[in-house]
Amino acid sequence: MEIFVRNKPYTGPVKAVVLDWAGTTVDFGCMAPVTAFIEAFALRGVEISASEVRGPMGLMKMDHVRALCGLPSVSERWRELFGRIPNEDDVRLVYGDTVPLMVLSVADHAELIPGLLPAIGYFRGNGIKIGTSTGYTTPMMEVLLPRAEKRGYRPDSVVCSSDVPRGRPFPFMCYRNAIDLEVYPLEAVVKIGDTVSDIREGLNAGMWTIGVSKSGSDLGLTEAELDALPADDLRNRLALVESRFLEAGAHFVVEHIGRCPEIIEEINDLLSQGEVP
């Protein structure tokens, strides 16, 4: 390993990427978590919408349930049924229902997102290590990982929210990836994901960040739904997603993972000029 001493700016190149899973590399539209959360709340008699589920997307799944229970709309529906707003015991109960449902849903949504394998080829060809972070827990990833591998995708490092003290937006999964990959400084790493939580995670870790708009949770459309959408409507929706990501601090926004290699080249140019995230 080449030793870098921080007595001068790091001038490149990019050494690693940390990729999200659902909505970024697999599961176009990030459908698996949405299905599982809706079904888990339905078991308690509480109806929630896909748009409500997508709001906190990217968080550790327990934190996601907690965030959903804290929504005024969901909290009010819960109060109407049970005479009180949901408490921490309720969060744990719903999360307990969510885990097996999520495992089943993940298994049904393991297709690779178009453009991933060419991007992986670029990373490999340029000596860029591939790490991953996810709001999924280890049991969920134990189902997803072999299915992705059969389709040709096997990252060098897989870090789950259950592997670290706190999930996104805390940077600990990014730190664990850097350790597992033996990569530093952190400005040599690029975090790529499809949620605001991904972007905040990368920024908090001191990494470059790329938001993925078209295949991700914020847009929230399957490929078939995307194809059926009028072009003007799609452009407007993508512009809104891009705006949200840039407001959150993303350095770059692309439509899908296949566009990331050209952004890596741009980041290499910025690093060579002494720029940092």
From Swiss-Prot:
Record's cofactor remark: Binds 1 Mg(2+) ion per subunit.
Cross-referenced InterPro entries: HAD-like_hydrolase_sf, HAD-like_sf, HAD_sf, PGP-like_dom2, Phosphonoacetald_hydro
Residues annotated as signal peptide: none
Residue numbers annotated as active site: D20 (nucleophile), K61 (schiff-base intermediate with substrate)
Keyword line: Hydrolase, Magnesium, Metal-binding, Schiff base
GO cellular component, one term: cytosol
Domain of life: Bacteria
Cofactor(s) the protein needs: Mg(2+)
Record's function text: Involved in phosphonate degradation.
Subunit structure, as described in the record: Homodimer.
Family: Belongs to the HAD-like hydrolase superfamily. PhnX family.
Protein known as: Phosphonoacetaldehyde hydrolase
Protein species of origin: Syntrophobacter fumaroxidans (strain DSM 10017 / MPOB)
